[in-house]
Amino acid sequence: GYFTASLLTQYCTACFRPFPSEGARRAFLCYLLSSLLELYHSFVEHFTEFWREDAKPIYQRSGGFCEHLARGFLPDVLGFAAVPCFPQITTSLTPEFAQLDGKARGQAHELCLVLSRYLLLERERWDTMEDAVQAIGAVTQIYLDCLE
């Protein structure tokens, strides 16, 4: 949860910190979203692998139980990504936010709050992590468009 939250706060601050170019910013934002995807898929893959190796035989024989559990991870992962962001928004000790000046920090805080709230309240809505990541990008774009 905290690692996914860290990726989310990095994403929010990257929207407002200086980059050599907008292309560099977009590439970094894509990298962070790709990292969220990779982290989630790696977790599910390792869980499934450990299930096959270590689950009690009675559970292994019950067809589809592992897959059922794995499908339930997505809302949990999204919730555990969102919740740690709330206290990080309210403190100046968070390194990601501390590197920004006043206005940029406020905007990054606000974006992080918007995304965290959205992920927490809508986490049951998505069937795949790809859907959730696409929603993060869409909400971010709406937020940034409102600033213009």
Question: What are these model-derived regions, one by one?
Answer:
Residues 1-55, 81-99:
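Active-site activation/catalytic loop segments of kinase-like enzymes and analogous catalytic loops
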Residues 42, 58-65:
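Long, amphipathic alpha-helical stalk/connector segments used for oligomerization, subunit docking
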Residues 63-148:
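ATP/Mg2+ or Mg2+-diphosphate-binding catalytic cores
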